[in-house]
Amino acid sequence: MNRRNLLASATGIAAVGAATQSSTAQEAAMTKHEFKLKYAPHFGTFSPVASKSLSDELNYAHDRGFTAWEDNRFLLRTPEEQKEIAETMEKLDMSMGVFVVTGSAGATEPTFTVQNDDAWNLVLEDIKKGIEGAKRCNATWMTVVPGAYDLKSDWNYQTANCIELLKRCSDLLEPHGLVMVLEPLNQHANHPTMFLRESPQAYQICKAVDSPACKILFDVYHQQITEGNLIPNIEASWSEIAYFQAGDNPGRKEPGTGEINYRNVFKYIHDRAKAEDLDFIIGMEHGNSMKGPEGCEAVIQAYVDADNFEVS
C-alpha cells in the first residue's frame, strides 16, 4: 500500500471510529431508564437540553425514565403555564409531587409560632389557594414551612402555637384528601432563623396535630446536616413521613457528589414502602454539579447509580 492510500485508509478508519463514538453517545443520551422509585426532577434540572417550553422539559424527563415531577413555584405560575404543566403531565402519566403553599424559607418574622390573627389568616388563605392549585395539577402534597422562631417566646409556647395553626390548616385540607408536608430546614448551612429544624421535632408536631392532612417532608439533605443518623431517623419517624427529597451534602447537588450513601437510603425507603404497599415520591431538590448537557447526564447517571440496589 502506497503512502497516499495508507493515509486515506487511516483517515477513513478514524472517521468511522468517530462516527461510532458519536452514535454511542447519542444512544446513551436517549436511554430510558427503569427506576425502582419515583424520582421527581424540577424545572431547570434538564433545561440545558430541553429549554423550548415547560412541556419540553417534562417530555425529556419522561423520555429518560422519570415518572414524577415537582414544582415549588406552581402557584406562582400563570394560568396558562399551570394548564400546560397539568395537561402535559396527564398525557405522560407522570405523578405530581410537591409545590410550596405557604411559608418562606428566608423569613425572619414569626408566623406559625406566635398567636397573631392577621398572620394566621394569611396562612389559612394560602392553604385555600393551595387546595385550588392542587385540583388544577392533580396534586396530593403541598409543602408548608412553619416560618421563623420567635426570639421573645419560650420554645414550648411556640410549639403549641404551631400545632394549633396546623390543626386549622388540616381542617381545610382533610375534606379534599390533600396533605401538607412540613419540611424541617437546616440552620447551619441555609436557614438559620427557621423554627422547624429536625425530623424528631416534626414527628412530635405531626403526632400532636393527629391528622392525615399533616405529615413530614423528609429532606435527606437537610436532615443530614441537622441530625445525621439518616436511616434510623427515617425509621423512627416513618409513620408520619409522606414525602422525601434528596440532595447530597456538602453542596446540595445530585447523589454521589457528597457524603451521603444514597444507595442505602433509597434501598431502605424502597424495601419498606414495598413491604407496606406504600408509594413515595423522591423530590430531586438540588442543583446540578456541572453545567450544560454534561451536567444533565451526570444527574441522570447519579440516580441510575443510587437506584442500583438489590431489592429485598
Show the residue positions of the predicted features.
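Catalytic-core regions built around general acid/base machinery
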Residues: 84-91, 168-172, 233, 265-268
